[in-house]
Amino acid sequence: MISFSLLLLISLLTCAGQLCQKQAVMCWRSDVYQRASALKWLIGAVILLAVGMLFWLRLLQILPLGIAYPMLSINFIMVTLAGKFFYQEKAGIKHWSGVVFIMLGILLMSLNE
């Protein structure tokens, strides 16, 4: 149970870091005055991703790499959903089908655990 909680925390931190990167790029494309805020978003991204990596190293002490790394694919699901809800990004049927297959794979791996 602790490994699943840790994996979920890592995924949330990584997803948040990716969203900060996206926000930084969007600020950078704006006018010159908003470029300073892009740096703040980038710093936030680095911090979130670094903390996620520290928890990842802890998770690798608990789970084998062959189990932990594929289960990290939950990030694809989180980032896809976040892109849709926060940035109104479009994803086609093939993309959503891939997300469903990832979810099935994660389910199968967690049943083996």
UniProtKB/Swiss-Prot annotation:
Its main location: membrane. The keyword Glycoprotein does not apply. Signal peptide: none annotated. GO terms for molecular function: carbohydrate derivative transmembrane transporter activity. One of its GO terms (cellular component) is plasma membrane. Pathway: Bacterial outer membrane biogenesis; lipopolysaccharide biosynthesis. Keywords: Cell inner membrane, Cell membrane, Lipid A biosynthesis, Lipid biosynthesis, Lipid metabolism, Lipopolysaccharide biosynthesis, Membrane, Transmembrane, Transmembrane helix, Transport. PANTHER family: 4-AMINO-4-DEOXY-L-ARABINOSE-PHOSPHOUNDECAPRENOL FLIPPASE SUBUNIT ARNE-RELATED, SMR FAMILY PROTON-DEPENDENT DRUG EFFLUX TRANSPORTER SUGE. This is Probable 4-amino-4-deoxy-L-arabinose-phosphoundecaprenol flippase subunit ArnE. It comes from Photorhabdus laumondii subsp. laumondii (strain DSM 15139 / CIP 105565 / TT01).
